[in-house]
Amino acid sequence: LYSFFAFVIMPNKNHKESRTLFVREAKKLYQKEFIKWFKLTAEINPLLRFFRNVEVKIPTLYVMGEEDYLFLPSVRKMTEAHLSASLFVVESCGHVVNVERPEVFNSAVLSYLGKL
């Protein structure tokens, strides 16, 4: 189940390190905890739709991989609708940007924080 779910979220060859990390950490959870976490994912897109309609006035940076097929479309819509939200999309990267491209992730975050 862990490997399958990891492959659904991170299917590309360049996502291998993130998949491996996900599976390793998921195995540390008790099965009951993992199932609760898995069910939580069903609530993500409705939650993102909610946040699209309710703007948070705090400056917010979303760092997403262009290959994050699960969440990027919703986050893109949200950041287009909110003045306080910014989106930084990392090319050739999947769901776990800080693992796949840590230098790019850190640079984007530090640059954003430096402008606040």
PLM features: residue spans?
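Alpha/beta-hydrolase fold catalytic core
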Residues: 28, 114-116
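Post-His helix in hydrolase/transferase enzymes
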Residues: 99-113
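Conserved alpha/beta-hydrolase catalytic His-Asp/Glu region
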Residues: 1-54
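Short amphipathic alpha-helical segments and helix-helix/interface helices
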Residues: 50-53, 75-76, 110
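Short alpha-helical
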Residues: 32-33, 69-70, 104
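Conserved loop-alpha-helix segment in the C-terminal half of the alpha/beta-hydrolase fold
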Residues: 57-93, 99
